[in-house]
A protein has these predicted regions:
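N-terminal intrinsically disordered/low-complexity leader segments
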Residues: 1-4
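Helix-turn-helix
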Residues: 8, 12, 16-50, 54
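An amphipathic alpha-helix signature
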Residues: 10, 77, 81, 85, ...
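Hydrophobic alpha-helical connector segments
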Residues: 54, 68-93, 144
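Short, basic, alpha-helical segments at the C-terminal edge of helix-turn-helix-like DNA-binding modules
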Residues: 57-62
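Amphipathic alpha-helical packing segments from all-alpha helical-bundle domains
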Residues: 64, 108-142, 169
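Short secondary-structure transition hinges
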Residues: 86-127, 153
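Hydrophobic alpha-helical segments that form the core
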Residues: 135-159, 164-174
Length: 177
């Protein structure tokens, strides 16, 4: 299926923001790489900030669609395992998006959408820890989310899948009862 110019701009911006960073990527470069005029970028997105917002929103829509099946699991142990598997699965499917997010980690736009996405995952995890009888399910959820964040960063910056998988299996074993 042919991409619209608007979609091409988004895809190109994502790649360049992931490679060079948001601040180091002028809209003129996005236009050149996408094969469109810079004016067309502003016609569709008005500003570079709005373009970034659109790239982040589109990325989280894709991530949400891809991860839905992982967090509807009723078995609490399987849910925890699914959440632990998310960094591997989602980074492999959306490497550029997560590379961009890694660069934008301190930006409000990135934090806002990441919190919105992770909130529902955290609610599901808290329910899983309650089902398993943990004394402090909220804290267990925070700890697990910190582990997931660390796994995400590790896999994003180090593509040694074997080492990553060993760590992942070790963490999963700690949650099996």
């Amino acid at each position: 299926m042919l991409k619209t110019k608007k979609e091409l701009i988004l895809e190109t911006a994502l790649t360049l923001f992931a490679d060079k960073g948001y601040d180091a990527t002028p809209t003129s470069l996005i236009a050149k790489e996408a094969g469109v005029s810079e004016g067309l970028i502003f016609k569709h997105y008005v500003s570079k900030d709005n373009l970034l917002e659109a790239v982040v929103k589109a990325g989280y829509r894709r991530i949400t669609d891809r991860s839905k099946g992982l967090v509807v699991e009723e078995d609490p142990i399987k849910l925890i395992e699914n959440v632990l598997d998310m960094p591997l699965k989602l980074v492999e499917e959306e490497r550029n998006f997560w590379r961009m997010q890694f660069r934008l980690v301190d930006e409000e736009i990135s934090q806002k959408h990441h919190m919105r996405y992770s909130h529902s995952v955290m609610q599901k995890l808290e329910g899983a820890f309650k089902k398993l009888g943990y004394e402090e399910p909220e804290l267990e959820t925070e700890i697990l989310m910190l582990l997931v964040e660390g796994l995400w960063r590790l896999y994003l910056t180090n593509e040694d899948k074997g080492h990553f998988t060993k760590m992942l299996d070790l963490i999963k074993a700690k949650y099996k009862r």
